[in-house]
Structures are given as C-alpha cells and as structure tokens.
Amino acid sequence: MNYELLTTENAPVKMWTKGVPVEADARQQLINTAKMPFIFKHIAVMPDVHLGKGSTIGSVIPTKGAIIPAAVGVDIGCGMNALRTALTAEDLPENLAELRQAIEMAVPHGRTTGRCKRDKGAWENPPVNVDAKWAELEAGYQWLTQKYPRFLNTNNYKHLGTLVTGNHFIEICLDESDQVWIMLHSGSRGIGNAIGTYFIDLAQKEMQDQLETLPSRDLAYFMEGTEYFDDYLRAVAWAQLFASLNRDAMMENVVTALQSITQKTVRQPQTLAMEEINCHHNYVQKEQHFGEEIYVTRKGAVSARAGQYGIIPGSMGAKSFIVRGLGNEESFCSCSHGAGRVMSRTKAKKLFSVEDQIRATAHVECRKDAEVIDEIPMAYKDIDAVMAAQSDLVEVIYTLRQVVCVKG
C-alpha cells in the first residue's frame, strides 16, 4: 500500500504523501471535506497537497448526488499544454532573452494596476486564431449571459489566448535528448473566476439556514436534480472548454513566435499522443469508478487513466515531467498537478530576496525581480520526492528542464 490512510467520522482519506510534508491545516481541511455525507468511497490526496482556498490543493473529491462549487474553485479548467517540437537545443538562439521577448509579445500577460485603462493581460485586437476559438464558445456564452446577465460584465473574449499571473507560465524546455518542448499553464481567466465566485456565493446563500451544520461554509453544495446544480455544471463545462481553447490559442501563438525567431518549422509532421497534451487540473466531470457513475472534482490533480498522458511541472527552475497514467483506481485514476507549495506566497516574499531568486534560476532566462519571488523554487516541494510518492500512479515518459520561462 503506497498511501497513508487517514480515518474520519465518515469517508476515509487516502494520501499518496510518503516522503513529502503535509501541513496540519491541510489535513484538517481534508478531514472536514471527508465528513460530507455524499463523498463516494474516499478522498484521494496527491503528493503536492497543500492548504487551499475553498478546498485542499492536490485533492480528488468523488461525490454522488451533489457538487461543492468551492472545491472546484474559481480557477476553473486551469491546466497545462505541452508540445514536443521538431527543434533541438542547437536551433535555439544564443541570446534566449530574444526568444523570451518574442513570446511576451505574442501572448498578453500580466496584471493591470492602478487606473490604467489598458488591461495588460488582454488583447486590444484579438488575432484570427482567437476569433476561431471564440466561435466554438459563442453559443454557450449566449446561454450563460441570457440566464445570468451579470456575466456580460466580465473579461471573456479578449482574455482568450492569454496568460494569467501567479504560478501560471509559458516555458521553453529541453528533454533528455535535447528536443525542444513548449509547455504552458493557464485557465479560464476572468470569466472562469466570475463563474466560480458567483456559484460559490450562490451555494452558500441557498444553504444559509444550514451553514452552521457544515464543517466549513466553503463546503456549501448543490444537490443533483436542482436547477442550480444543472446550471452550475453547464457553466463549469463551458468555462473548462474556454480554458482548453485558451491554452490551444496560446500554444499556436507561441509556436508562431518560436518559428519567427528560429526561422525553422516548429511542429513535427506527425505528433504522437505523448508529444502534444492538453489537460485540466482544476475541474469537475462525470466519470465511472468502482462500477458506479459519480462526479469527480480534481482540485490540483490530473486524470491518469491507464495509458493517458499528463503533465507534471516542477517549480520555476526545477524539472518537469511528461507522464503516462497507470490507472490506479484507488486514486480515482489521478496524479499530482505539480510540486506543491511548502510555504505561502507571503512567507516566501519575506524569507527570500531577489538575489536568492537570481541564484536559484541562474540556468533559466526568466524574470528575476521582487514581484516573482513567491515563485522561487525553494517555496515548493522537492519534485523528485513528489514523483517517488506517486510511482504507482504514473510512469515518467520524458523529463524536461526549463531554459526560458515567461511569467505574468
């Protein structure tokens, strides 16, 4: 048995955390969630687990007859894309700052501050490929905004194909044979945040009279068969599609930027399934497990069915992995979505300096300023320990190292 079993008053918690630290607060948050009567079988916990807002990052929450909106959270559909290109390390320019700048020009990124009218993280004039992706989203957007007009006043179309801030990134990586990979991390942007926030608040309002009976107000839920349950699932499915198409558009524009710098064809003539991957790690969907149809919420976890390919990034400056799922049913066929934090962003900014950041990322062309100190590699768990703890969940296909990293 490769997991630790945590017993509770209701469902147990199975934790793939051997050799990695787990905060006491995260354990308590997991115990609180496991107390809910509609948890199916058990909660599965990945080795990158840490305390989260609403629910525990790195948890897989199977439910029957209900969904907890705060467990999905506000970064709906957040996930990863990776593409193995036709390029090798020799094809990259000597001056990697030039490549980083080209990517930054190709993909809007960053947070708008003060009273600046221009949103740095949005398009002024979206390109043609964004228009094509939006066409796939338009019908769902019409339903969403007709039923909930509040979502008209959100960043949506102009956020498609853009990079959010925080731990989201675009990277150029090399594998063991020096083949160039593009890897990126983003989600459903402003519209996904608005959908998540609204339905979390709505669930709490609908359960106002029962909130005191819950272990936490964040565990307010919608019951299957109700109008809000159906609307939430439909809105979340749309946001998850937005997130997937957002990453596709970003990837297309990074490919174009890389092509302009190298003057070489970036995409391989034929790409294998393990060489082009788009996967969510913050989402909910209906799945079959243990012979029953249930809802699975992965909060910072990746689907890892037998033969299914996934992406597990390390911290900025650490290794990342392309993996193949082993279909471990006890984990609800899941694996970690990254390394997982060992300290809060606030603590990291107090503990480390710009000089620490420069030393830790000396081998990567990336930002090395005070605003990204919270992403310093030392703020995250050891990715090798994380991978060892889930050796029965996935097998490593490629190991990647970053050479360029773009942060919002």
Where are these regions (language model features)?
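Domain-length cofactor-binding catalytic modules of enzymes
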Residues: 2-29, 38-43, 51-57, 61, ...
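Active-site-surrounding "flap" and adjacent substrate/cofactor-binding loops of secreted or lumenal enzymes
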Residues: 67, 77-123
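Catalytic palm active-site di-aspartate
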Residues: 75-76, 186
